[in-house]
């Protein structure tokens, strides 16, 4: 599909407003359930097709998605911002409907599993994550599933690869050095496609990289990551880990 053609690039400005109030109920000491309301409004302007043949007429339409969402999670992480042990299993489902004010009817199923394993060597951590974002219905352009950015497969410009379905896996070794210094090494793969049945090993997007960590206060790191992806590189400066 056009999502995967490197030449099909469009430059544009993008404005977004979103709100997602949610009520959470603790089920037990490791689990939560939640129900919420999700509102997203997006508009694009100043389009430049950069000599590509892509039809961007859909992007010229503002998008409004309004719906209900439901969350379930199971969380045994020892520290949410920078875990060294435990796991997180989370399912977030969204149901957007025109009778609630949405322009179209569609659903989003966002699934995530993360695990953190302490390593004997100097409190190092092996972390890994599997994530999928599956959609169904008349999905507007701004609600397509994306890969890239500082957490969803570093190295790719977020939004460059987007489609109705997304699947990714990533693993990271977090190494403590002397004092408050540390390093990380990671690799990951991801895919986007129109339908789940269209996922193909021919369309795998690889990512790998190295990062430096500085502990500004206990269990809170500044991170600098250099990521290498397919025909792209990325540099990221953030607080706390990618996942």
What are these regions (language model features)?
Residues 1-5, 46-56, 87-95, 145-154, ...:
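Flexible, solvent-exposed coil segments and beta strand-coil junctions
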Residues 19-25, 37, 70-74, 111-115, ...:
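Residues on the lipid-exposed face of transmembrane beta-strands in outer-membrane beta-barrel proteins
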Residues 58, 68-73, 77-177, 183:
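C-terminal outer-membrane beta-barrel translocator/porin domains of Gram-negative envelope proteins
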């Amino acid at each position: 599909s056009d999502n995967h053609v490197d030449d099909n690039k469009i430059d544009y400005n993008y404005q977004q407003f979103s709100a997602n109030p949610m009520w959470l109920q603790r089920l037990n000491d490791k689990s939560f359930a939640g129900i919420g309301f999700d509102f997203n409004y997006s508009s694009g302007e100043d389009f430049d097709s950069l000599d590509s043949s892509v039809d961007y007429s859909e992007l010229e339409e503002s998008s409004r998605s309004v719906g209900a969402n439901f969350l379930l999670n199971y969380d045994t992480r020892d520290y949410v911002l920078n875990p060294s042990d435990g796991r997180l299993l989370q399912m977030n489902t969204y149901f957007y409907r025109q009778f609630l004010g949405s322009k179209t009817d569609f659903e989003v199923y966002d699934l995530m599993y993360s695990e953190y394993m302490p390593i004997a060597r100097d409190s190092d951590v092996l972390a890994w994550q599997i994530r999928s974002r599956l959609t169904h219905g008349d999905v507007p352009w701004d609600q397509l599933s994306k890969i890239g950015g500082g957490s969803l497969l570093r190295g790719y410009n977020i939004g460059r690869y987007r489609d109705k379905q997304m699947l990714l896996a990533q693993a990271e070794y977090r190494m403590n050095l002397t004092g408050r210094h540390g390093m990380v090494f990671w690799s990951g793969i991801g895919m986007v496609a129109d339908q789940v049945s269209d996922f193909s090993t021919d369309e795998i997007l690889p990512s790998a990289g190295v990062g430096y960590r500085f502990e500004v206060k206990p269990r809170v790191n500044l991170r600098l990551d250099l990521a290498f992806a397919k025909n792209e590189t990325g540099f990221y400066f953030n607080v706390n880990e990618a996942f």
